[in-house]
Curated annotation (Swiss-Prot):
Topological domains annotated Extracellular: 1-27, 78-101, 163-198, 261-275
InterPro entries documented for this protein: GPCR_Rhodpsn, GPCR_Rhodpsn_7TM, Olfact_rcpt, OR51/52/56-like
Species assigned in the record: Homo sapiens
Topology in the lipid bilayer: Multi-pass membrane protein
Protein name: Olfactory receptor 51T1
One protein family per Pfam: 7tm_4
Keyword terms: Cell membrane, G-protein coupled receptor, Glycoprotein, Membrane, Olfaction, Receptor, Sensory transduction, Transducer, Transmembrane, Transmembrane helix
Amino acid sequence: MAIFNNTTSSSSNFLLTAFPGLECAHVWISIPVCCLYTIALLGNSMIFLVIITKRRLHKPMYYFLSMLAAVDLCLTITTLPTVLGVLWFHAREISFKACFIQMFFVHAFSLLESSVLVAMAFDRFVAICNPLNYATILTDRMVLVIGLVICIRPAVFLLPLLVAINTVSFHGGHELSHPFCYHPEVIKYTYSKPWISSFWGLFLQLYLNGTDVLFILFSYVLILRTVLGIVARKKQQKALSTCVCHICAVTIFYVPLISLSLAHRLFHSTPRVLCSTLANIYLLLPPVLNPIIYSLKTKTIRQAMFQLLQSKGSWGFNVRGLRGRWD
């Protein structure tokens, strides 16, 4: 069965929507959307590649940043086919099975990103509040354990939800408000009582994301208390500057996530075009902005990226030179 096609809707498919009411402008809208996807793919790939290849970046802070880049890259790839399929080819149909698979990965990678942001907050907490023991607390083994917990966490909580959804029947042919499958909207079209799965989804979001947000806030309360206790003003500013990128990453991830969730669960009269816009912001804002923020604010990352680009350029020049000698 095809993942999506542009045929007439059937009872075993959902209809995806990019921007309701703006179908005539989809070709023009696809230009900035495609540019944003390109920036997200190239930016996160570059960040990940730089951290993996440069040995001086093999430190806990950069390990967590590479995890964030990898998650953003995967989240971008998960929704890329359906978003561009709707905008370019009007390929609106998606089968139930493909929808469930995409929905699982969208929510799994979102939960992964939330977990990585928590790990990064812990890293900043240890670096500022307990700098003398930073190397002994965040060892390579500890970073590996944290990474494994981050990967296992979505499977433990989301697989039961996916199994439960797979056992119920759905009304086919309904239009979704997004160019991808999102649990709070998909679950509305079940024949059985949708409130059970909806309640479980709400519980998971409040429990998991809520716990993550509280942990991050608590970490920054302790960080702020430590920074305010520093006498030298320059040292205060330096300590706070190391947290700016992470605070930006937390903001651009949680604000769209919470806004989209509230629009679906509490404000049922929200215009569909607004829901679609929020969905695209939720998907694209973190993957696009995170590489830009970290490359601009982190001198080490910026220098490593320039060095990598220069080495690739010089390698290409040398190859062309060798070809010129033998031609």
